[in-house]
Amino acid sequence: MQDTQRSARVTHGLLRAGEPHDSRVVVQQCEVGLVRVRRDGARLEFAAPPLRRTGPLEPAVLHQIIKALRLTSSDIRHHQWVDNGPGWCAVMLSSASQVLSLQPDWAVLHPLKVGVVGPHPPSHEADFEVRAFIGHGAYEDPVTGSLNASLAQWLIGAGLSPSAYVAAQGTAMQRAVAFTCEGVAMTSGSAEMSQIA
């Protein structure tokens, strides 16, 4: 079972079971440490953890990603370490359709955890498409709070996105979820999860 799915199930189960001291707050142990998850109606909100590693990707790491995703260096618009615990690195492509067409070479991607983001056309309900590829284990995660939190910090902080945007993830797996990011805050649509700074 994937760690993200396990965490989502545990948090969902905790919200429905027992009587915590404050029924609006659950504290979840994550790689980054303890994360307070606040319930607001059907939404879950949690503070975006600080980035542990930022800055441009090293040339060797970027080359590995380009090769693993079957891209060329000109396909990469921007790249960055966006590690808030799990070790995420990220690349931005020129379009959401390019992101959706990716078919990684898992053997080359190993052991990286790579987030890929690309803009949708203005008429689309989401501003960006996000995919999360985990090289160790060779799988794609359909909904990744830690990645979307760190992408929001990077994209908004670097002026690569507006201060409020919607990102879709899971589309390529027919499991689409929308994350709404405001400032360095984020909410997730069908899972109704919010992330606040």
Identify the function of each model-found stretch.
Residues 1-2, 9-197:
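Active-site proximal loop and beta-alpha junction motif in alpha/beta enzyme cores
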